[in-house]
Amino acid sequence: ETCPSYYRDASAEASIDDTADFLHAVSAMPGNNGQVMPVITPRFIPTCSDAALRGLGDLAAETGAHVQTHCSEDDWEHAHVQRRCGMSDTAALQDFGLLTDKTILAHSTFIDDDDMAMIAAAGSGVAHCPLSNVFFSNAVFPLRRALEKGLHVGLGTDISGGPAASLMDTARMTAIASRMLEEGVDASLRAGARGVPSSRVDFRTAFW
C-alpha cells in the first residue's frame, strides 16, 4: 500500500528468489574473493510485506549475508510500524529475523532504551546520518546515549538525503547536531527545559 504498483516485486517469493540470485551473483563474481559483499536490503518495513520480511530474514540466516535497512527514521515510519506490527521498528526487525550481528540500521532516530538494548544484544550497528536527519527525520539521533549503551555506531552520508557526500562534513554535522540536542532549539522554552542534558559529543568522538 505504500509502494506504487510499477515499483513492486511480483510477489514476496519472487523478491526473495531475486535476492538469493543477487547474493550468489555478487559472491561468484570473478576475482571478487570476498572483497565485495552482497547485502540484503529491505528498504524499510512500510514498503515490504510481512512475508517478504520474514523470507529475507530466513535468507539472512541461511546465507550469513549482511543486512541494511532503515529503522525508526521519522515520525511517520515509527508510527506506521507501531500501528502495523504492534511493536517498535527494532522489535519488528528482530521478530522478522533481520536484526543480526551483520545488520546496519540507518538513522534509528526514534529508538528508545529498550530498542538500544536489543540492538546491542544482537550486535547490530547504526548508520548515523546527521545531515539527512535534518531534512527528513524530525528529530536528532541521541548519539552519545547510544554510545554509552554500547551500540556500534558509524557515520552515513545518505547521499540522496543532503547536499554533501563527504564523511568529514558528516563528522562536523554530528558534533553540531549533538550540541543542538543538548541545548535545544525552541527559544520559547526556558534553558533547563529546552534540550537533553549530556548529549553533546566532540569532533574527536564524531571522527572516530
PLM regions: where:
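His/Asp/Glu-enriched, well-ordered alpha-helical/loop segment
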Residues: D95-L98, K102, R144-W208
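Short, contiguous acidic/charged loop-to-helix segments that flank catalytic cores in large enzymes
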Residues: N133-V134, P197
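Acidic, glycine-rich active-site loops and adjacent beta-strand->loop/helix elements
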Residues: T2-P4, S132, G161
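Metal-coordinating catalytic core of metallo-dependent amide/deamination hydrolases
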Residues: E1-T109
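Catalytic core of soluble alpha/beta enzymes
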Residues: E73-A122, V134-R145, I159-D169
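Electropositive phosphate-/nucleotide-binding environments in soluble metabolic enzymes
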Residues: D9, E13-I16, P46, D50, ...
